[in-house]
Amino acid sequence: MKFGTFLRLLKIENAQNAFANLKKNSFSCCHLVYKPDVYTEEDARIVKAAADENRIEISALFAGYKDDFTKWNLYSDFEDAGINSAKYGKERIEYLKQAAVFAKNVGTENVLIHAGFVANNPFSEEYTVMVNLVKEVAEYLKALGLNLLLESGGESPIVLKRLIEDVGTGNVFSNLDTANLIMYGLGNPVDAAYTLGDLIKSVHIKDGMPPVKPRELGKETEFMQGFVDFPRVFSVLKDNHFDGPYIIEREISDESAAQKIAETLEQLKKMLSA
């Protein structure tokens, strides 16, 4: 069973220390977040060498967007987030294609993205646009031998499954974020684990609360202090024969972050070995 966390690499010269720190803290894998102005082969070589030396598997490149127009809310992000943004989508897809080559060069098989909000109505123009855009990215990745993982949250689980089936390239899967579904107010991870089944390639371990303000996401909490029913989530994942990677994600930024992640890892191992 594989356990990891996020590795947010801000400067390429920090790669060796960053991967060594993961090894020191008993992680065997990570989701890499690296968003340079331009992806280069040399940067990929440095990252791969650091990961290999420390025996850390890069389970996915979490390919964000270079811009900062996404606000992570339930209002402006319907227009501004994701690859389906009329204003920013085209530029983001081109950046993702750079990221895909980088992912190939660092040795991972998976590129993970926030695609954007997905329309419920399969006959709507918005839904058709999203299918076509995801297909464009997925086909580009498939030519490189890569999978596209869609982060859960901005749609109900059954809508995400429909989208994956309608794209139909065979290399599109889901990353189940246990808190996002609750924080977006669009579902819960127990149902999602059941609905998505073997489409789940990785899981983000995160806890949170439902939204109460119509324009704002629910709040993230510490592990086991929110609305996520982790024992039931893990039970359903076990029934699906999912064996990891489990990636601890903590977006709460404070001085106790490293300690809290270490504590979550210990709790997680105990729960999954029970």
Where are these regions (language model features)?
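Flexible loop residues that form catalytic
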Residues: 35, 66, 116, 153, ...
